[in-house]
Amino acid sequence: MRHRKSGRQLNRNSSHRQAMFRNMASSLVRHEVIKTTVAKAKELRRVVEPLITLAKSDSVANRRLAFARTRDAEVVGKLFNELGPRYQERPGGYTRILKCGLRTGDKAPMAFIELVGRPEDAEAVEADDSAE
């Protein structure tokens, strides 16, 4: 029985899941928006949001924890230099999942997962306001 077992298996073994979410988290931090399946996006939230919360208080210990979870120095730098200060006043809820239809090959439900308040969002809102 699966009682009290949280998280999705996604038909992968644990090392594959860990590597996949490590790579997806790095991609999301680097590009601030990625396209994936809805199930992976929902599970990715559980990986990325604690990383951003960790980045809100910059210390050597927190940087080492973030590096242990991402294994990418560039991503750790962006987390602590850009994302931590950006979300300093926000108490969680750093990601947004937008469903975007079905994948062509297998009809899997797809979604964009993005960081809220990213600079492109602000530019798009300003463009919409000026058009009206």
UniProtKB/Swiss-Prot annotation:
Q: Which SUPFAM superfamilies match?
A: Prokaryotic ribosomal protein L17
What's in the keyword line of the UniProt record? Ribonucleoprotein, Ribosomal protein
Q: Which GO terms describe its molecular function?
A: structural constituent of ribosome
CC annotations in GO = cytosolic large ribosomal subunit
User: Which biological process terms from the Gene Ontology are attached to this UniProt entry?
Assistant: translation
User: Its domain of life?
Assistant: Bacteria
Ribonucleoprotein is among the record's keywords: yes
Q: Which Gene3D superfamilies match?
A: Ribosomal protein L17
Q: Which residues cross the membrane?
A: none
- Spell out the NCBIfam families in the cross-references: L17 (TIGR00059)
State whether it acts alone or in a complex, and with which partners, per the record. Part of the 50S ribosomal subunit. Contacts protein L32.
- Family as reported in the entry's similarity comment: Belongs to the bacterial ribosomal protein bL17 family.
Its name, as the record gives it, is: Large ribosomal subunit protein bL17
Q: Which gene encodes it?
A: rplQ
